[in-house]
Amino acid sequence: MHVKRAATAGFCMGVGLALKKLDRELDNNAKDIATLGPIIHNPQVLRRYEQKGVRCYTDPAEARSGQRVVIRAHGIPEETESALAAAGVDLVDATCPKVKRAQLGIARQREKGRTLLLFGEHDHPEVQGLLSYAGEGAVVFGSLEELQNGPLEDDRHYFLAAQTTQDKHAFTSVIEWVRRRFGDHVPVLDTICDATRERQDEAIAIARSVDVMVVVGGFASGNTRRLAEVAQAQGVPTYHVETPDQLPLDAIRGYGAAGLTAGASTPKSIIDETQKLLESL
């Protein structure tokens, strides 16, 4: 089988920086390292760090004074970070710079008295962190339809932002509707990162030129799920797998050309293995 592999597949800048910071702590022989939540959304990578002794705390209360704790790439709520610092926890901030920029941009709009409309996944850790910078009244929505049916008030001064890994085309539709509803003066923060845009555009282009698409990455990874969604929207059969052994070989064996892309937290080794398996069909 011929395979068209996306040039943008694999670790993004934010993931790479976060893992470098965690690796640096391990290289410095720190004995008591933990992350606050999964540092990235890839179970194979997380398993590797667990084998090196890195613990993953789901509850901030697990962190102890003096302990080295790495903040996940998705960021954490502002009040959680402040409480941990006040408790004497030695924090290493591995928040993606694009997420940090979104957090600070939202905080500046809050100071101007504006209310956030956030396009994102309600339960995603990045979204929970962004909301903590927004103040009261923020509205989270996962689709334009949800926003249209949401609790919007005519006398509020809104601004728009998106989870950094959201679908840029869907966000454009949201912007257009909000400005028709509330006026062109509604501020829009440019929070969808360049890597997300580039990956989605390349996934769309490849999907339009192949018989089947394979997207590799963690099932909990929002950006990976979005890649699968935009590829499938082109009308091509699309399979989202975490590892090559999850590929439905009987279902894809008869196709002539396969497209291959991967989420921002997918290691190159797994992408390589998937490509090799596809090419053997």
Swiss-Prot record:
Binding site for isopentenyl diphosphate: H41, H74, H124, S221, N223, S265
Function: Catalyzes the conversion of 1-hydroxy-2-methyl-2-(E)-butenyl 4-diphosphate (HMBPP) into a mixture of isopentenyl diphosphate (IPP) and dimethylallyl diphosphate (DMAPP). Acts in the terminal step of the DOXP/MEP pathway for isoprenoid precursor biosynthesis.
Protein name stated in the entry: 4-hydroxy-3-methylbut-2-enyl diphosphate reductase
Listed EC numbers: 1.17.7.4
Family, as annotated: Belongs to the IspH family.
Encoding gene per record: ispH
Organism: Oleidesulfovibrio alaskensis (strain ATCC BAA-1058 / DSM 17464 / G20)
NCBIfam families per record: ispH_lytB
Gene Ontology terms for molecular function: 4 iron, 4 sulfur cluster binding; 4-hydroxy-3-methylbut-2-enyl diphosphate reductase activity; metal ion binding
Entry annotation: catalytic residues: E126 (proton donor)
Alphabetically ordered keywords of this record: 4Fe-4S, Iron, Iron-sulfur, Isoprene biosynthesis, Metal-binding, Oxidoreductase
Metabolic or biological pathway, per its Swiss-Prot or TrEMBL entry: Isoprenoid biosynthesis; dimethylallyl diphosphate biosynthesis; dimethylallyl diphosphate from (2E)-4-hydroxy-3-methylbutenyl diphosphate: step 1/1; Isoprenoid biosynthesis; isopentenyl diphosphate biosynthesis via DXP pathway; isopentenyl diphosphate from 1-deoxy-D-xylulose 5-phosphate: step 6/6
